[in-house]
Amino acid sequence: MKLKNNLLEKTLELSELFKIYKELLTDKQKQYFELYIDEDLSLSEIADEFNISKTAVYDSISKTSKLLFSLETKLHLKQKQDLLISLINKIETNQIDEKQFIKSLKEVIWWKY
């Protein structure tokens, strides 16, 4: 069961990273990745649709996944987005005051890696 959860978590994370970084990918990377992750097509279905080998699709999706994780490691856009969403929720539910919100917001904006 844990393996299934890890696979599901990884797929969800990749889907979120794809939404953030997809404009940095090639058209082919976007096509294959979206069909595989978001549309849940199999490697064979994608290969048939584009008249290429299953291995070529696998290689593209694998490289794209590594690239998305690499981009997040370098740019931290998803991590910042998650922090900002958390801050917004806290201010909306009065868990923090305006001063703390602004201080935390500055920390996210000027975050050093």
From Swiss-Prot:
What InterPro entries does the record point to?
A: RNA_pol_sigma_r3/r4-like (IPR013324), UPF0122 (IPR007394), UPF0122_fam_protein (IPR054831), WH-like_DNA-bd_sf (IPR036388)
Gene3D superfamilies found in the cross-reference section: Winged helix-like DNA-binding domain superfamily/Winged helix DNA-binding domain (1.10.10.10)
Superkingdom, taxonomy of origin: Bacteria
Q: What role is this protein assigned?
A: Might take part in the signal recognition particle (SRP) pathway. This is inferred from the conservation of its genetic proximity to ftsY/ffh. May be a regulatory protein.
UniProt record similarity statement: Belongs to the UPF0122 family.
Which PANTHER family does the entry link to?
UPF0122 PROTEIN CBO2450/CLC_2298, UPF0122 PROTEIN YLXM
In Swiss-Prot or TrEMBL terms, this protein is called Probable UPF0122 protein
Q: Which organism is it from?
A: Mycoplasma mycoides
